Amino acid sequence: MTESFQHISVLLHESIEGLAIKPDGIYIDGTFGRGGHSRTILSQLGENGRLYSIDRDPQAIAEAKTIDDPRFTIVHGPFSGIAHYAKQHGLAGKVDGVLFDLGVSSPQLDDAERGFSFMKDGPLDMRMDPTSGIPVSQWLMEADLDDITWVIREFGEDKHARRIAKAIVAYRENEENEPLKRTSQLAKLISDAAPKSFKEKKHPATRAFQAFRIYINSELEEIDTALKGAAEILAPQGRLSVISFHSLEDRMVKRFIRKESQGPQVPHGIPMTEAQIQALGSANMKAIGKAIKPSKQEIELNPRSRSSVLRIAEKL
């Protein structure tokens, strides 16, 4: 692995253990990243086992192509297409385990040219797949005040959303200013807009950068579709292992597993026959254990793991 691709997979042992790997099983790593989870799964598969990995980042695909293993297949695309890819390969209902490692990876954050980090100057891009969609810089030049405010508040949970949005709009409307195209420009703009009473330990731009990244990549919609797709293609007793990194992601995963574990709900106060109740179906999955967080040792080794949460479910 090249130096630029070095990456410490978060909750590696716990997430793979949660899949309960069968040597001859079929597995899907929905977020290849730099391959830490995929390589570990491959190391536990026998000759007849199969691993299919997915990623929409061209750099991740390039790294995946260095794996010369007949048991391994890489798919270039968003993980929301997991059900479609599984059906293409004749895997629907046959998959023994699916793993998702959500959010942005360390190599993406550390590569200034990708524009994900406010700590490094680079193009204000933030796209997971730079070949599709529009960069954040273009969106910020076109979006109105209300839209920018909504994105920061909804996806960054930033109480200063309106204040930051006003600063961005005021900046771009001043003809004397350079176009807003660099991460350092946006980070400074947000820092300057933060109230003097700002006392959070995090950088003032943390939440807004997260919000713009989530929005420009439609991350929450991707997660919702991917979770539903995974539940659809898993075989009975197949496992779903999901690592999230912020509260928006984790709430989605938690609610999904809870909903799938409860099954269809009978409307309160509406009389129904036993046959009608049975026709609604039953629970589709069950939660395996409680949410798992990284150990103190892992956090010391990899501080970025601090906010991670692992949840595991099993198809019934």
Curated annotation (Swiss-Prot):
Family matches, as SUPFAM superfamilies: Putative methyltransferase TM0872, insert domain, S-adenosyl-L-methionine-dependent methyltransferases
Catalytic activity: cytidine(1402) in 16S rRNA + S-adenosyl-L-methionine = N(4)-methylcytidine(1402) in 16S rRNA + S-adenosyl-L-homocysteine + H(+)
InterPro entries referenced in this protein's UniProt entry, alphabetically: RsmH, SAM-dep_MeTrfase_MraW_recog, SAM-dependent_MTases_sf
Molecular function terms from GO: rRNA (cytosine-N4-)-methyltransferase activity
Gene3D superfamilies: Putative methyltransferase TM0872, insert domain, Vaccinia Virus protein VP39
Pfam families recorded: Methyltransf_5
Coarse class of the protein's main subcellular location: cytoplasm
Keywords per UniProt: Cytoplasm, Methyltransferase, rRNA processing, S-adenosyl-L-methionine, Transferase
Function: Specifically methylates the N4 position of cytidine in position 1402 (C1402) of 16S rRNA.
Family to which the UniProt record says this protein belongs: Belongs to the methyltransferase superfamily. RsmH family.
Entries under PANTHER family matching the protein: 12S RRNA N4-METHYLCYTIDINE METHYLTRANSFERASE, S-ADENOSYL-METHYLTRANSFERASE MRAW
Protein name, entry field: Ribosomal RNA small subunit methyltransferase H
Species in which this protein is naturally found: Vibrio proteolyticus (Aeromonas proteolytica)
Gene: rsmH
